[in-house]
A protein has these predicted regions:
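Conserved strand-to-loop turn within each blade of WD40 beta-propeller repeats
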Residues: 81-85, 129-133, 173-177, 196, ...
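WD40-repeat beta-propellers
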Residues: 68, 88-92, 112, 136-140, ...
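Intrinsically disordered, low-complexity acidic/Ser/Thr/Pro-rich linker and tail segments
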Residues: 1-69, 73, 77-80, 205-224, ...
Protein backbone atom coordinates (compact mmCIF):
# COMPACT_ATOMS: atom_id res chain seq x y z
CA UNK A 1 0.00 0.00 0.00
CA UNK A 2 1.40 3.38 -0.96
CA UNK A 3 2.02 6.14 1.54
CA UNK A 4 -0.45 8.35 -0.35
CA UNK A 5 -3.20 5.75 -0.04
CA UNK A 6 -2.48 5.31 3.66
CA UNK A 7 -2.70 9.05 4.18
CA UNK A 8 -5.99 9.28 2.30
CA UNK A 9 -7.46 6.47 4.38
CA UNK A 10 -6.44 8.13 7.63
CA UNK A 11 -7.88 11.44 6.46
CA UNK A 12 -11.32 10.08 5.62
CA UNK A 13 -11.55 8.14 8.88
CA UNK A 14 -10.66 11.29 10.83
CA UNK A 15 -13.26 13.28 8.92
CA UNK A 16 -15.98 10.66 9.39
CA UNK A 17 -15.50 10.20 13.11
CA UNK A 18 -15.19 13.91 13.81
CA UNK A 19 -18.54 14.22 12.05
CA UNK A 20 -19.93 11.45 14.27
CA UNK A 21 -18.66 13.16 17.43
CA UNK A 22 -20.20 16.40 16.22
CA UNK A 23 -23.59 14.69 15.99
CA UNK A 24 -23.47 12.46 19.08
CA UNK A 25 -21.73 14.74 21.54
CA UNK A 26 -22.88 18.15 20.37
CA UNK A 27 -19.51 19.62 19.41
CA UNK A 28 -19.50 23.16 18.11
CA UNK A 29 -21.44 23.50 14.91
CA UNK A 30 -18.54 24.71 12.74
CA UNK A 31 -15.95 22.28 14.07
CA UNK A 32 -16.37 19.81 11.22
CA UNK A 33 -16.13 22.55 8.63
CA UNK A 34 -12.92 23.82 10.23
CA UNK A 35 -11.34 20.38 10.11
CA UNK A 36 -12.42 19.77 6.51
CA UNK A 37 -10.34 22.79 5.51
CA UNK A 38 -7.26 20.96 6.77
CA UNK A 39 -8.14 17.37 5.87
CA UNK A 40 -8.50 16.15 2.30
CA UNK A 41 -11.52 13.84 2.02
CA UNK A 42 -10.28 11.98 -1.04
CA UNK A 43 -10.55 8.38 0.16
CA UNK A 44 -11.83 6.36 -2.77
CA UNK A 45 -14.70 3.91 -2.38
CA UNK A 46 -12.72 1.60 -4.66
CA UNK A 47 -10.10 1.18 -1.94
CA UNK A 48 -12.67 -0.28 0.43
CA UNK A 49 -14.44 -2.40 -2.18
CA UNK A 50 -11.26 -3.91 -3.62
CA UNK A 51 -9.85 -4.95 -0.24
CA UNK A 52 -13.00 -5.86 1.68
CA UNK A 53 -13.58 -9.39 2.90
CA UNK A 54 -15.96 -11.29 5.16
CA UNK A 55 -14.38 -11.44 8.61
CA UNK A 56 -17.18 -12.67 10.90
CA UNK A 57 -20.51 -14.47 10.84
CA UNK A 58 -22.69 -14.42 13.96
CA UNK A 59 -25.07 -17.39 14.18
CA UNK A 60 -27.71 -18.19 16.77
CA UNK A 61 -30.99 -16.58 15.77
CA UNK A 62 -33.66 -18.97 14.50
CA UNK A 63 -35.63 -16.48 12.42
CA UNK A 64 -35.07 -13.38 10.30
CA UNK A 65 -32.77 -10.76 11.87
CA UNK A 66 -34.43 -7.35 11.58
CA UNK A 67 -32.04 -5.00 13.33
CA UNK A 68 -28.50 -4.53 14.63
CA UNK A 69 -26.67 -1.86 16.57
CA UNK A 70 -23.09 -1.39 17.70
CA UNK A 71 -21.59 0.10 20.83
CA UNK A 72 -18.19 0.06 22.49
CA UNK A 73 -18.48 -0.10 26.27
CA UNK A 74 -15.09 0.39 27.87
CA UNK A 75 -12.79 -2.21 26.26
CA UNK A 76 -15.58 -4.46 24.99
CA UNK A 77 -16.86 -4.31 21.43
CA UNK A 78 -20.48 -5.41 21.24
CA UNK A 79 -23.22 -5.90 18.67
CA UNK A 80 -26.86 -6.36 19.60
CA UNK A 81 -29.51 -7.85 17.33
CA UNK A 82 -33.27 -8.27 17.23
CA UNK A 83 -35.06 -11.06 15.42
CA UNK A 84 -38.31 -12.65 14.36
CA UNK A 85 -37.50 -15.37 16.89
CA UNK A 86 -38.61 -12.85 19.59
CA UNK A 87 -35.14 -12.56 21.10
CA UNK A 88 -32.56 -9.84 21.63
CA UNK A 89 -28.99 -11.11 21.53
CA UNK A 90 -25.65 -9.54 22.39
CA UNK A 91 -22.44 -10.54 20.63
CA UNK A 92 -18.79 -9.96 21.46
CA UNK A 93 -17.09 -8.83 18.25
CA UNK A 94 -13.63 -9.86 19.43
CA UNK A 95 -14.64 -13.48 20.07
CA UNK A 96 -17.62 -13.74 17.66
CA UNK A 97 -19.57 -15.29 20.53
CA UNK A 98 -23.03 -14.60 21.90
CA UNK A 99 -22.70 -13.31 25.45
CA UNK A 100 -26.31 -12.53 26.36
CA UNK A 101 -29.86 -13.41 25.32
CA UNK A 102 -33.11 -11.72 26.32
CA UNK A 103 -36.27 -13.67 25.51
CA UNK A 104 -39.13 -11.94 27.32
CA UNK A 105 -40.67 -10.45 24.18
CA UNK A 106 -43.61 -12.54 22.98
CA UNK A 107 -43.36 -11.58 19.28
CA UNK A 108 -40.86 -10.45 16.64
CA UNK A 109 -38.26 -7.88 17.71
CA UNK A 110 -38.11 -5.22 15.00
CA UNK A 111 -35.52 -2.76 16.27
CA UNK A 112 -32.66 -2.67 18.80
CA UNK A 113 -30.55 0.25 20.04
CA UNK A 114 -27.88 0.63 22.69
CA UNK A 115 -29.07 3.23 25.18
CA UNK A 116 -26.79 6.28 25.39
CA UNK A 117 -28.89 7.63 28.27
CA UNK A 118 -28.18 4.75 30.65
CA UNK A 119 -24.51 4.62 29.76
CA UNK A 120 -23.70 8.32 30.08
CA UNK A 121 -25.81 8.88 33.18
CA UNK A 122 -25.46 5.62 35.13
CA UNK A 123 -22.66 3.74 33.35
CA UNK A 124 -25.10 0.92 32.70
CA UNK A 125 -24.85 -1.22 29.58
CA UNK A 126 -28.45 -1.21 28.37
CA UNK A 127 -30.23 -2.22 25.15
CA UNK A 128 -33.61 -0.90 24.06
CA UNK A 129 -35.82 -3.10 21.87
CA UNK A 130 -39.18 -2.71 20.14
CA UNK A 131 -41.47 -5.59 19.32
CA UNK A 132 -44.64 -6.72 17.64
CA UNK A 133 -45.87 -7.55 21.16
CA UNK A 134 -46.73 -3.81 21.46
CA UNK A 135 -43.91 -3.05 23.91
CA UNK A 136 -40.56 -1.30 24.14
CA UNK A 137 -38.21 -2.87 26.67
CA UNK A 138 -34.86 -1.98 28.23
CA UNK A 139 -32.37 -4.71 29.12
CA UNK A 140 -29.37 -4.55 31.45
CA UNK A 141 -26.59 -6.54 29.77
CA UNK A 142 -24.41 -7.12 32.84
CA UNK A 143 -27.20 -8.02 35.26
CA UNK A 144 -29.24 -9.92 32.64
CA UNK A 145 -32.54 -8.34 33.58
CA UNK A 146 -35.30 -6.14 32.21
CA UNK A 147 -35.14 -2.58 33.54
CA UNK A 148 -38.11 -0.80 31.97
CA UNK A 149 -41.09 -1.44 29.74
CA UNK A 150 -43.10 1.06 27.68
CA UNK A 151 -46.53 -0.22 26.66
CA UNK A 152 -48.63 2.73 25.51
CA UNK A 153 -48.73 1.63 21.85
CA UNK A 154 -51.82 -0.39 20.98
CA UNK A 155 -50.21 -2.45 18.20
CA UNK A 156 -46.72 -3.66 17.31
CA UNK A 157 -43.79 -1.24 17.67
CA UNK A 158 -41.42 -0.92 14.70
CA UNK A 159 -38.59 1.64 14.51
CA UNK A 160 -37.09 3.43 17.53
CA UNK A 161 -34.49 6.21 17.86
CA UNK A 162 -32.82 7.98 20.79
CA UNK A 163 -32.54 11.76 20.87
CA UNK A 164 -29.13 13.21 19.94
CA UNK A 165 -29.72 15.93 22.55
CA UNK A 166 -29.85 15.80 26.37
CA UNK A 167 -27.74 12.64 26.52
CA UNK A 168 -30.28 10.47 24.73
CA UNK A 169 -32.93 11.03 27.39
CA UNK A 170 -35.79 10.86 24.87
CA UNK A 171 -36.90 8.04 22.59
CA UNK A 172 -39.27 8.13 19.64
CA UNK A 173 -41.06 5.09 18.27
CA UNK A 174 -43.21 4.23 15.26
CA UNK A 175 -45.98 1.68 15.41
CA UNK A 176 -48.56 -0.43 13.61
CA UNK A 177 -51.12 1.77 15.37
CA UNK A 178 -50.18 4.52 12.84
CA UNK A 179 -48.63 6.79 15.48
CA UNK A 180 -45.24 8.10 16.58
CA UNK A 181 -44.70 8.29 20.32
CA UNK A 182 -42.10 10.41 22.13
CA UNK A 183 -40.96 8.99 25.48
CA UNK A 184 -38.99 10.28 28.46
CA UNK A 185 -36.56 7.45 29.25
CA UNK A 186 -35.85 8.87 32.71
CA UNK A 187 -39.49 8.76 33.83
CA UNK A 188 -40.74 5.98 31.49
CA UNK A 189 -43.60 8.27 30.49
CA UNK A 190 -45.08 8.98 27.08
CA UNK A 191 -44.79 12.73 26.46
CA UNK A 192 -46.67 13.03 23.19
CA UNK A 193 -48.33 11.00 20.45
CA UNK A 194 -48.00 12.29 16.87
CA UNK A 195 -50.98 11.46 14.67
CA UNK A 196 -51.25 11.90 10.91
CA UNK A 197 -50.12 8.75 9.15
CA UNK A 198 -52.79 6.54 7.64
CA UNK A 199 -50.96 3.25 8.12
CA UNK A 200 -48.08 1.56 9.96
CA UNK A 201 -45.10 3.77 10.83
CA UNK A 202 -42.14 1.53 10.10
CA UNK A 203 -39.20 3.88 10.64
CA UNK A 204 -38.31 7.05 12.55
CA UNK A 205 -35.30 9.32 12.96
CA UNK A 206 -34.49 12.48 14.94
CA UNK A 207 -32.58 15.35 13.35
CA UNK A 208 -28.93 15.35 14.49
CA UNK A 209 -28.55 19.12 14.86
CA UNK A 210 -30.82 22.03 15.68
CA UNK A 211 -32.44 23.70 12.70
CA UNK A 212 -32.57 27.14 14.29
CA UNK A 213 -30.35 29.42 16.37
CA UNK A 214 -31.88 28.59 19.73
CA UNK A 215 -29.05 27.14 21.81
CA UNK A 216 -30.84 27.19 25.16
CA UNK A 217 -30.47 23.48 25.91
CA UNK A 218 -32.13 23.83 29.33
CA UNK A 219 -35.40 25.20 28.01
CA UNK A 220 -38.42 22.92 28.44
CA UNK A 221 -41.15 22.93 25.81
CA UNK A 222 -44.87 22.49 26.38
CA UNK A 223 -44.74 18.67 26.39
CA UNK A 224 -41.87 18.50 28.89
CA UNK A 225 -38.91 17.95 26.56
CA UNK A 226 -35.70 19.64 27.71
CA UNK A 227 -33.23 20.68 25.02
CA UNK A 228 -35.37 19.60 22.07
CA UNK A 229 -36.32 22.98 20.68
CA UNK A 230 -35.32 23.21 17.02
CA UNK A 231 -35.19 19.44 16.53
CA UNK A 232 -37.53 17.44 14.34
CA UNK A 233 -38.67 13.85 13.89
CA UNK A 234 -39.10 12.24 10.49
CA UNK A 235 -41.22 9.13 9.98
CA UNK A 236 -41.77 6.72 7.10
CA UNK A 237 -44.95 4.74 6.70
CA UNK A 238 -46.84 2.08 4.79
CA UNK A 239 -49.09 4.96 3.65
CA UNK A 240 -46.21 5.83 1.22
CA UNK A 241 -45.43 9.18 2.88
CA UNK A 242 -42.59 10.68 4.90
CA UNK A 243 -43.66 13.22 7.49
CA UNK A 244 -41.69 15.82 9.46
CA UNK A 245 -42.74 16.73 13.01
CA UNK A 246 -41.56 19.64 15.16
CA UNK A 247 -40.63 18.45 18.67
CA UNK A 248 -41.11 21.93 20.16
CA UNK A 249 -44.60 22.61 18.78
CA UNK A 250 -45.58 18.95 18.12
CA UNK A 251 -46.96 20.08 14.76
CA UNK A 252 -46.54 18.34 11.42
CA UNK A 253 -44.24 20.50 9.28
CA UNK A 254 -44.22 18.70 5.95
CA UNK A 255 -45.30 15.64 3.99
CA UNK A 256 -43.13 14.09 1.28
CA UNK A 257 -44.95 12.21 -1.47
CA UNK A 258 -43.19 10.22 -4.18
CA UNK A 259 -42.68 6.66 -3.05
CA UNK A 260 -45.21 4.22 -4.50
CA UNK A 261 -45.08 1.63 -1.74
CA UNK A 262 -44.21 1.19 1.94
CA UNK A 263 -41.23 3.16 3.29
CA UNK A 264 -38.84 0.99 5.30
CA UNK A 265 -35.99 3.35 6.20
CA UNK A 266 -35.45 7.10 6.72
CA UNK A 267 -32.22 8.87 7.69
CA UNK A 268 -31.41 12.52 8.35
CA UNK A 269 -28.22 13.86 6.83
CA UNK A 270 -25.57 15.86 8.66
CA UNK A 271 -23.30 18.84 8.05
CA UNK A 272 -23.56 19.71 4.33
CA UNK A 273 -26.56 17.35 4.10
CA UNK A 274 -28.23 18.73 7.22
CA UNK A 275 -31.38 19.67 5.31
CA UNK A 276 -31.70 16.33 3.53
CA UNK A 277 -33.51 13.07 4.28
CA UNK A 278 -32.68 9.73 2.69
CA UNK A 279 -35.35 7.04 2.30
CA UNK A 280 -35.71 3.46 1.06
CA UNK A 281 -38.92 1.74 0.03
CA UNK A 282 -40.67 -1.41 -1.14
CA UNK A 283 -40.93 0.35 -4.52
CA UNK A 284 -37.24 -0.61 -4.96
CA UNK A 285 -36.01 3.00 -4.96
CA UNK A 286 -33.86 5.23 -2.76
CA UNK A 287 -34.85 8.89 -2.64
CA UNK A 288 -33.21 12.06 -1.34
CA UNK A 289 -35.44 14.89 -0.11
CA UNK A 290 -34.93 18.58 0.66
CA UNK A 291 -36.47 19.29 4.07
CA UNK A 292 -36.88 23.02 3.44
CA UNK A 293 -38.71 22.80 0.12
CA UNK A 294 -40.31 19.40 0.58
CA UNK A 295 -39.08 18.48 -2.89
CA UNK A 296 -37.41 15.30 -4.06
CA UNK A 297 -33.76 15.97 -4.96
CA UNK A 298 -32.71 12.60 -6.35
CA UNK A 299 -34.13 9.15 -7.00
CA UNK A 300 -31.81 6.15 -7.23
CA UNK A 301 -33.05 3.14 -9.20
CA UNK A 302 -31.27 -0.17 -9.64
CA UNK A 303 -32.53 -2.52 -6.96
CA UNK A 304 -34.91 -5.30 -8.02
CA UNK A 305 -36.38 -5.86 -4.58
CA UNK A 306 -37.54 -3.94 -1.52
CA UNK A 307 -34.97 -1.48 -0.15
CA UNK A 308 -34.87 -2.32 3.54
CA UNK A 309 -32.16 0.05 4.80
CA UNK A 310 -30.36 3.20 3.71
CA UNK A 311 -27.22 4.68 5.31
CA UNK A 312 -24.76 7.51 4.76
CA UNK A 313 -21.39 5.82 4.32
CA UNK A 314 -18.04 7.16 5.63
CA UNK A 315 -16.75 7.30 2.05
CA UNK A 316 -16.47 10.10 -0.48
CA UNK A 317 -15.60 9.98 -4.16
CA UNK A 318 -14.11 12.46 -6.57
CA UNK A 319 -16.28 13.52 -9.47
CA UNK A 320 -16.41 16.34 -12.02
CA UNK A 321 -17.61 18.90 -9.46
CA UNK A 322 -15.37 17.89 -6.56
CA UNK A 323 -15.85 15.46 -3.70
CA UNK A 324 -19.21 13.79 -3.17
CA UNK A 325 -20.69 11.73 -0.36
CA UNK A 326 -21.49 8.07 -0.89
CA UNK A 327 -24.74 6.52 0.31
CA UNK A 328 -25.43 2.83 0.79
CA UNK A 329 -28.55 0.67 0.51
CA UNK A 330 -29.43 -2.93 1.39
CA UNK A 331 -32.21 -4.83 -0.34
CA UNK A 332 -34.22 -8.02 -0.59
CA UNK A 333 -32.63 -8.43 -4.04
CA UNK A 334 -29.57 -9.82 -2.19
CA UNK A 335 -27.35 -6.82 -2.87
CA UNK A 336 -25.76 -3.90 -1.06
CA UNK A 337 -25.26 -0.93 -3.38
CA UNK A 338 -23.22 2.27 -3.15
CA UNK A 339 -24.36 5.50 -4.82
CA UNK A 340 -23.00 8.98 -5.53
CA UNK A 341 -25.39 11.24 -3.64
CA UNK A 342 -25.02 13.98 -6.27
CA UNK A 343 -25.84 11.73 -9.21
CA UNK A 344 -28.78 9.45 -9.94
CA UNK A 345 -26.81 7.49 -12.52
CA UNK A 346 -25.95 3.82 -12.06
CA UNK A 347 -24.62 2.67 -8.72
CA UNK A 348 -20.91 3.01 -7.98
CA UNK A 349 -20.52 -0.51 -6.67
CA UNK A 350 -22.70 -3.58 -6.10
CA UNK A 351 -21.97 -6.23 -3.48
CA UNK A 352 -23.75 -9.40 -4.58
CA UNK A 353 -24.71 -11.62 -1.66
CA UNK A 354 -26.38 -14.97 -1.07
CA UNK A 355 -29.11 -13.67 1.22
CA UNK A 356 -31.73 -10.95 1.33
CA UNK A 357 -30.49 -7.94 3.30
CA UNK A 358 -32.72 -6.68 6.11
CA UNK A 359 -30.42 -4.08 7.69
CA UNK A 360 -26.88 -2.74 7.57
CA UNK A 361 -24.61 -0.48 9.59
CA UNK A 362 -21.14 1.02 9.24
CA UNK A 363 -19.05 0.49 12.35
CA UNK A 364 -15.71 1.71 13.61
CA UNK A 365 -14.07 -1.29 15.25
CA UNK A 366 -10.76 -1.83 16.94
CA UNK A 367 -8.22 -3.90 15.06
CA UNK A 368 -7.80 -7.47 16.25
CA UNK A 369 -4.19 -8.08 17.22
CA UNK A 370 -2.18 -11.24 17.76
CA UNK A 371 -0.91 -12.18 21.20
CA UNK A 372 2.59 -11.05 20.32
CA UNK A 373 1.44 -7.67 19.03
CA UNK A 374 1.16 -4.58 21.15
CA UNK A 375 -2.47 -3.59 21.61
CA UNK A 376 -3.40 0.03 21.02
CA UNK A 377 -6.77 1.73 21.41
CA UNK A 378 -5.95 3.84 18.37
CA UNK A 379 -5.85 0.87 15.96
CA UNK A 380 -9.22 0.85 14.24
CA UNK A 381 -10.96 -0.02 11.00
CA UNK A 382 -14.26 0.58 9.25
CA UNK A 383 -16.54 -2.44 8.98
CA UNK A 384 -19.84 -2.91 7.21
CA UNK A 385 -22.14 -5.18 9.19
CA UNK A 386 -25.36 -6.48 7.70
CA UNK A 387 -28.20 -8.82 8.63
CA UNK A 388 -29.93 -11.32 6.42
CA UNK A 389 -33.39 -12.80 6.15
CA UNK A 390 -31.68 -16.16 6.65
CA UNK A 391 -31.01 -15.66 10.39
CA UNK A 392 -27.35 -14.60 10.09
CA UNK A 393 -25.30 -11.48 10.83
CA UNK A 394 -22.21 -10.75 8.75
CA UNK A 395 -19.30 -8.38 9.19
CA UNK A 396 -17.25 -7.19 6.21
CA UNK A 397 -14.00 -5.30 6.60
CA UNK A 398 -11.39 -3.72 4.42
CA UNK A 399 -7.92 -5.21 4.69
CA UNK A 400 -6.63 -1.73 5.45
CA UNK A 401 -6.51 -0.70 9.09
CA UNK A 402 -6.10 2.89 10.20
CA UNK A 403 -4.04 4.11 13.12
CA UNK A 404 -5.49 7.44 14.24
CA UNK A 405 -3.15 9.76 16.09
CA UNK A 406 -5.43 11.68 18.43
CA UNK A 407 -2.92 14.43 19.07
CA UNK A 408 -2.71 15.27 15.39
CA UNK A 409 -6.49 15.12 15.06
CA UNK A 410 -7.00 17.86 17.63
CA UNK A 411 -4.14 19.94 16.29
CA UNK A 412 -5.93 20.22 12.94
CA UNK A 413 -8.59 22.49 14.41
CA UNK A 414 -6.08 25.18 15.29
Amino acid sequence: MTEQLKEEEVQIIIHHWIRTLNIKLGWIKDFDNIVVNYVSTAFMLDSFCSSSKLISTFTGHTNIVWSIDRSIFDDSQLICSGSGDSTVRVWDIDTNKQIQLFDEHSASVYCVKFSPYHYYNYHQYVICSSSNDETIRFWDIKDNKQLQIFNDHTLGVCGIEFSPFNGGRYLCSGSDDNTICLWDVETSKSLHVFNGHGDTVFCVDISPLQNNNNYNDNKMNNIGVIGGNGYTICSGSRDETIRIWDIETTKQLNVFNGHKECINSVKYGSNELLNAILSGSDDESIRLWDIRSGEQIQVFNGHSGSVMRVEYSPFVIKNSIGNSNVICSGSFDKTIRFWDIRSNKRELHVMKLDERVTCLKFMKLKKKVNNNEKKSNSDSCVNLCYCSAEELIYSISSNAYYKLKIVKLFMMSK
